[in-house]
A protein has these predicted regions:
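Intrinsically disordered, Ser/Thr/Pro/Gly-rich linkers and terminal tails that flank
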Residues: 1-114, 145-146, 151-200, 212, ...
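Acidic surface patches and DE-rich sequence motifs
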Residues: 115, 269-271, 333, 348
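Short, structured beta-strand/loop micro-motifs enriched in basic residues and often containing a Trp
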Residues: 120-127, 382
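Cleft-lining beta-strand/loop regions that shape enzyme active-site pockets
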Residues: 122-125, 133-139, 147-150, 157-331
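Structural motif
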Residues: 140-142, 337
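Hydrophobic beta-strand signal
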Residues: 144-145, 340
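Conserved P-loop NTPase
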Residues: 328-333, 339-374
Length: 411
């Protein structure tokens, strides 16, 4: 019987839930927002809202907190836009959003997964150099107790929020490993979430996966890319499958390291105002490049793929991307909360807006219909190469394409 499991890398972060950053975000300082056209908040609407509030207070079956109603009202204004990418963030959720995009968290540096039936929690991944790794935690360890509580009686999000709260100077865990109890004490600290993974493949081919475009992605990419070049990589595969996007600044700073001089991406708002993001072209890539994409490659990942394709510096392999060609801006409201809304469209260097369409690969390779798709690409790219290629037909084709490009260049 297949067991149902949920996983949360936020244990490292101490965040309560995973916050998907499916769109590029800008962060702006709080200021006065001009009113354009007729205001929704008038004496008439305020009076109606007050009347509804009184009816709820008097007649609703259960007691309702006024703060909860207010939060729902704010959220409703954004929900009325009918835009899945626009929304209201309470103070708590805005903090989580910011932490997610920054890629840095207060935590101990590991991911965990919980069996939804037995509630057993195991260590899924222990980040290199993290407090957890230094304390001796290993992947596969069963978390038996957290402090003085049984881990199986807690939810992953509860543990995560507890770490994030900063209420503890150190965290005591009892682990089960091969039937033996192991006690470790860990001091939470700022942990940078690893979002770039790399390795060398046979035939001097380099592989680099980008899971998400956070603030830390450009520097992590730089280190990994430089290391692959030191190992004499003659070609490079950049894997963007299942990458939901992230920060516009992050993807631009990453592309700056491989593109020639020219346009990376530009945006236009409803008034026709255009903002361009360009590359100086100081370090254009000089080896053959393959970019691996799928239907879950979205937003900033599509900016990356679109720029590579339009500049003709690489070959796209996989399936058509998600098709998110719009940009959101986040406005802090001064009290810790914020609103995020769609403010512009983005265009690839050749002037293409891919919203609702996606980017088609140069070489299409669909995942087998009779085979489950991996939740995380890193579940496969840490396998021995031969086993990996046997399980991953898209990666296998990428290696074939890249090998051909390298051979062609060497002629």
């Amino acid at each position: 019987m297949k067991k149902n499991k949920t996983w949360l890398r936020g244990f490292a972060a101490g965040i309560g839930v995973s916050v998907a950053v499916g769109g590029t975000l800008f962060y702006v300082q709080y200021g006065t927002l001009p009113l354009i056209g007729d205001s929704v908040v008038t004496g008439k609407t305020a009076s109606k809202a007050a009347r509804i509030e009184r009816l709820i207070e008097k007649n609703y079956l259960e007691e309702v907190e006024s703060e909860s109603m207010a939060e729902g009202m704010y959220a409703g204004m954004l929900a009325s836009l009918g835009d899945p990418y626009s929304g209201y963030f309470s103070e708590e959720n805005y903090k989580k959003l910011m932490e997610s995009t920054e890629g840095k968290y207060t935590g101990i540096g590991l991911s965990m997964q919980q069996d939804t039936e037995t509630k057993e929690i195991t260590v899924y991944e222990c980040f290199e150099g993290s407090p957890a790794e230094q304390a001796g935690v290993k992947e596969g360890d069963v978390i038996y107790t957290v402090g003085d509580r049984m881990a199986s009686e807690m939810e992953v999000s509860e543990i995560s929020d507890w770490i994030k709260s900063g209420e503890m100077e150190e965290l005591k865990l009892v682990l089960l490993r091969d039937g033996e109890e192991i006690t470790v004490t860990i001091v939470p600290e700022t942990v940078e979430l690893p979002v770039v993974r790399s390795r060398m493949l046979p035939e001097e081919l380099g592989y680099l996966q980008i899971e998400e475009f956070t603030e830390g992605t450009p520097e992590q990419f730089k280190k990994a890319y430089e290391e692959l070049k030191k190992q004499k990589a003659q070609g490079l595969i950049i894997d963007l499958r299942n990458n939901p996007g992230g920060l516009l600044t992050s993807v631009c700073d990453t592309l700056e390291q491989i593109l020639p001089e020219g346009m990376i991406v530009y945006t236009e708002d409803r008034y026709g105002n255009r903002e361009e993001h360009t590359c100086e072209g100081k370090t254009p890539i000089e080896i053959p490049l393959v970019v691996l994409v799928n239907e879950e490659s979205a937003s900033a990942a599509e900016i990356f793929a679109g720029a590579v394709k339009d500049h003709q510096v690489g070959t796209l392999v996989g399936t058509t991307t998600f098709g998110k060609g719009i940009v959101q801006k986040t406005y802090p409201l001064g009290d810790g909360s914020a609103v995020k809304m769609t403010v512009s469209k983005y265009y690839t260097p050749n002037g293409v807006n891919i919203h609702g369409e996606g980017i088609s690969p140069d070489v299409e390779v669909k995942w087998p219909e009779d085979k489950d798709k991996p939740v995380r690409i890193s579940d496969m790219n840490e396998l021995p190469v031969q086993e990996w290629l046997e399980q991953d037909n898209q990666m296998k084709k990428s290696v074939e394409v890249l090998s051909g490009l390298v051979a062609e260049k060497e002629k």
